[in-house]
């Protein structure tokens, strides 16, 4: 089976050097997902040749960096002869257009003694007797012929990919992963921009919390382009015991700040250059502008919040698409540790609490459980 893979449009806009790097990473990710076959680059697309019984082909729809792909039939060295293309088109498409209204779409790369319009007209005439008619605007079936120099490719399916950038081209980011609806979506969105997520989870719910986090990451692993996901599970109960020493209204923001501080140490350890969270502006009390400022104050790494402008309905819709929603919805909101959280915490208070608590963030990270998924 031969498959033509079209990279995301934005990859084509890169400089020649960056484009080669992105396409090389995409090819490696595809190899990791498909697990067998031959792949090569040619004139802005990738070709993948695999056994006909390969069951991993549908996984290409979850490989970031792919705009679309199509299983194709091809003929080589047709000597610039349109008649050869017409005959092959009849062989490939006659059953597909049978009894249906159809259209032919053609495009070419290279020098030929015919135009793309010639191909559409001649192939359309040849297929017409098998069909119920032609409609270029609203066909029941579209058939495609793509001529690249001396090779013609025939296909009738264009399967959409997730677009974005190949996972790995943007380096690593440490993701604060609670396991709720938001953090898996934020993780997915950072992978879509080419980042490899390093997952940091503060376990506040014991074995149940751990179980659902692992299930969510198993879903996200299918979108990772073959990259393994490394999970660091911190014992959040010990942190909560510490936080019981400070004023209730400040505890939620302080908990988030502890998470950021541990994430900062993990960035150092994992060679990650950013921290990612599922925070959305003003969604809950800890996510007001003031509290976000206090939470991230003094953190040396950039903090990405890919959901910052999303409302909850939009986030839920994405979670359903990704496949994490069914697990996220079963988890309690473990981070809601105070019913009277303030929407505007004073920075001086938090810094004073932080000094008094004297948490050893390095030790918190050292005592974490590490799992590779």
From Swiss-Prot:
Any GO BP annotation: thiamine diphosphate biosynthetic process
Pfam families per the UniProt record, alphabetical: ThiI (PF02568), ThiI_fer (PF22025), THUMP (PF02926)
Record-level Gene Ontology MF annotations: ATP binding; CCA tRNA nucleotidyltransferase activity; tRNA binding; tRNA-uracil-4 sulfurtransferase activity
GO CC annotations, alphabetized: cytosol
Limits of the THUMP domain: 54-158
Catalyzed reactions: [ThiI sulfur-carrier protein]-S-sulfanyl-L-cysteine + a uridine in tRNA + 2 reduced [2Fe-2S]-[ferredoxin] + ATP + H(+) = [ThiI sulfur-carrier protein]-L-cysteine + a 4-thiouridine in tRNA + 2 oxidized [2Fe-2S]-[ferredoxin] + AMP + diphosphate; [ThiS sulfur-carrier protein]-C-terminal Gly-Gly-AMP + S-sulfanyl-L-cysteinyl-[cysteine desulfurase] + AH2 = [ThiS sulfur-carrier protein]-C-terminal-Gly-aminoethanethioate + L-cysteinyl-[cysteine desulfurase] + A + AMP + 2 H(+)
Pathway annotation: Cofactor biosynthesis; thiamine diphosphate biosynthesis
Enzyme type, top EC level: transferase
Family: Belongs to the ThiI family.
Protein purpose: Catalyzes the ATP-dependent transfer of a sulfur to tRNA to produce 4-thiouridine in position 8 of tRNAs, which functions as a near-UV photosensor. Also catalyzes the transfer of sulfur to the sulfur carrier protein ThiS, forming ThiS-thiocarboxylate. This is a step in the synthesis of thiazole, in the thiamine biosynthesis pathway. The sulfur is donated as persulfide by IscS.
Protein name in the entry: Probable tRNA sulfurtransferase
């Amino acid at each position: 089976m031969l498959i033509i893979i079209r990279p995301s449009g934005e990859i084509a806009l890169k400089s020649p050097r960056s484009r080669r790097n992105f396409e090389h990473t995409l090819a490696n990710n595809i190899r990791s997902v498909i697990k067998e076959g031959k792949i090569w680059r040619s004139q802005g697309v990738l070709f993948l040749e695999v056994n006909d019984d390969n069951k991993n082909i549908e996984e290409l729809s979850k490989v970031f960096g792919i705009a679309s792909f199509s299983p194709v039939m091809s003929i080589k060295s047709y000597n610039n002869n349109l008649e050869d293309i017409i005959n092959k088109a009849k062989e490939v498409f006659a059953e597909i257009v049978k009894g249906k209204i159809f259209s032919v779409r053609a495009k070419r790369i290279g020098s030929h003694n015919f135009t793309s319009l010639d191909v559409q007209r001649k192939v359309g005439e040849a297929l017409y007797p098998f069909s119920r008619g032609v409609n270029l605007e609203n066909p029941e079936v579209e058939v495609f012929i793509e001529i690249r120099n001396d090779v013609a490719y025939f296909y009738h399916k264009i399967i959409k990919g997730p677009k974005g950038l190949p996972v790995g081209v943007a380096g690593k980011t440490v993701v604060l992963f609670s396991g709720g609806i938001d953090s898996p979506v934020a993780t997915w969105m950072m992978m879509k921009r080419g980042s490899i997520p390093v997952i940091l989870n503060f376990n506040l719910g014991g074995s149940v919390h751990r179980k659902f986090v692992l299930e969510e990451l198993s879903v996200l692993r299918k979108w990772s382009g073959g990259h393994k996901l490394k999970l660091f599970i911190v014992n959040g109960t010990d942190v909560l015991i510490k936080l019981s020493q400070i004023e209730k209204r400040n505890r939620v923001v302080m908990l988030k700040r502890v998470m950021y501080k541990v994430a900062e140490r993990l960035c150092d350890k994992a060679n990650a250059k950013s921290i990612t969270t599922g925070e959305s502006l003003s969604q809950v009390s800890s996510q007001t502008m003031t509290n976000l400022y206090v939470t991230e104050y003094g953190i040396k790494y950039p903090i990405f919040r890919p959901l910052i402008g999303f409302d909850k309905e939009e986030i839920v819709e994405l979670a359903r698409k990704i496949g994490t929603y069914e697990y996220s919805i079963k988890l309690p909101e473990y981070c809601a540790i105070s019913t009277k959280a303030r929407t505007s915490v004073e920075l001086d208070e938090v810094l004073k609490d932080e000094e008094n608590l004297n948490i050893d963030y390095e030790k918190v990270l050292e005592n974490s459980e590490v799992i590779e998924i």
